[in-house]
Amino acid sequence: MKNNIVIITGITASGKSELCDNLIEKYGNISIINCDSKQVYEEIPIITAQPPKQEVFYKLYGYVSAKENYSVGLWLEDLEKEVNHALENAQIPIITGGSGLYISSLIKGLSSMPQISQKVRKNVSELRKNLSKEEFYKLALSKDPRIQGKVFMNDSHRLSRALEVITETGKSIFVWQENRQPPLFNNFKIYTILPKREDVYRKINSRFITMIENGAIDEVKKLLSMNLAPHLPAMKAHGVPEIIKYLKGEITLDEAIQIAQTNTRHYAKRQYTWFKKQFLNAEVIDCANKLKIF
């Protein structure tokens, strides 16, 4: 196999996990390595749809404490070890997940991003909380005009990040992103799964209901009991902020479910746009069942 590292990416709820299960069952000599920024956290396996811990084929899932502000740089270090271990043991590494920053850093190299002070992070977080979406977007755009057409109003996470960087350094986040380290590997084949939107949206809705039934609320209760800072990544996993509002009595459970489903669908919509513009050498398929790797 010329490209002995496989990357399977795509939008949320596109069937990546089911595909990996099938590949393990069919071939066996593979190592599934996580490329999802929230599935690394140990305390939230249900709401991030992690595979069972006893599955020895799966690597880099549920092994980081939610107390940690885990970064793409740390993930690349862990990834390199797992890929090399797989290759040394005659296994094919299959890197899978939908976190765009992780995948982009793997393929194109890691950007030399600046450290953001707690003061700036807190100030931006307060602005994000107190301003409307439109006001927050206009503020970010006034500080960094380069975000126009690249970061959109509903993408509050990327807007916050852009505002943090320009506030901390005086330089656009895109200036920092242009300064990249060499990529870890270049011998890979990438597949992007982009199913029909209505199928994805339907699965997002049903999957969140299943997560609630399987104990997601208790999972978030335990997360709350840890008294974590709200800016930590685990606290921003899809469904966590909405369930926290429910547990605090701010909204009903039905409202929490509906809002979480809506927010995740919006995230999937943004992923569609992003993945279509990225990785032009990827093989794009509309259904995980159509993917043929070997």
Swiss-Prot record:
The keyword tRNA processing applies. It catalyses: adenosine(37) in tRNA + dimethylallyl diphosphate = N(6)-dimethylallyladenosine(37) in tRNA + diphosphate. Its EC number is 2.5.1.75. Residues 36-39 are annotated as: Interaction with substrate tRNA. GO terms for biological process: tRNA modification. Keywords: ATP-binding, Magnesium, Nucleotide-binding, Transferase, tRNA processing. ATP binds at G10, I11, T12, A13, S14, G15, K16, S17. GO terms for molecular function: ATP binding; tRNA dimethylallyltransferase activity. InterPro entries: Dimethylallyltransferase (IPR039657), IPT (IPR018022), P-loop_NTPase (IPR027417). The record marks S99, R128 as: Interaction with substrate tRNA. Belongs to the IPP transferase family. This is tRNA dimethylallyltransferase. It comes from Wolbachia sp. subsp. Drosophila simulans (strain wRi).
